[in-house]
């Protein structure tokens, strides 16, 4: 199987001490892994390091050349609260591609159980479970090779 991501000697230091030290692993196409740990042990931080949102204190993350990665956020960003579900799903795409991909956003939202009427509602009206499904659709719209899910 082809390698999608390689983490080498990752170290993340916080004000409370190290979260992880010399963490190394490889993710290949078809791999499915889960992280289990107590609150504050670094699970979300690791995902942020893997997707480039946060730089490690030391170490490196390498992504395969044509690999597209997406991370499902843990919480709905406040900036999306005034957007419709459709707008929120299309937002991760380049502006010039959004109209052409509207059909895909509608299909993803329908597969997640949203009706056309709900797709036009503001995201602030959603329950917690509905927000989680919306966040998954936001990641899937990019058709990633590697999907990182945070809770």
Predicted feature residues:
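ABC ATP-binding cassette signature C-motif
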Residues: 1-151
